[in-house]
Amino acid sequence: KEETIVTNQVRFEVKLLGATVFQVEGYSEEKYLKDQLISYNSKTLQNDKEKFVNLVFDKDRNKFDIKGSSYNGEASIDNIIGNWWSHKILQTNSQISPISGSIKQQIVTFVGKEKIDLYNKIYNVDHFTLKSKDISLPKDKRLDFDIWYDSKNFIIKKISYQRMGLWEYYL
């Protein structure tokens, strides 16, 4: 298959004692041509703040051109969009924020092989941590994730992090 399109739609809110403390609604689309990202577009409303990314691959310069709510400029094609569907996030030194377009340097560390139980099924996975390289970033801007990866099927099975409580994503 020549072209692949990945769409992502998210909408949720967190309420505490009836008051909304966090709210996100967004949509994104990634386009790949023969495994090369050629465009990424997203619009997100996060706590009433509009955020966006418009990224295109410049074939002549072999770079990404990014117009985002937090970053405008170019980026190396070694960057990966920081979405959880692609295991390539574990193989790069930096990622592009899927919400704002900012570029974040990261350190990925292999923790070990584990077995996890998801939906009453046991999976053999590799456990990694993914953290911001720049520890001077404010804590709420840092990358700090635990990731469980099924290397047999090339699928990230679970992600967890702490921010206003424990968040976990399962596939």
What are these regions (language model features)?
Residues 76-94:
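Beta-strand/loop-rich accessory regions of lumenal/periplasmic or secreted enzymes
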Residues 42-82:
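Hydrophobic, well-structured mid-protein blocks that either form specific transmembrane helices
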Residues 1-57, 88-171:
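Acidic, serine/threonine-rich low-complexity disordered tracts
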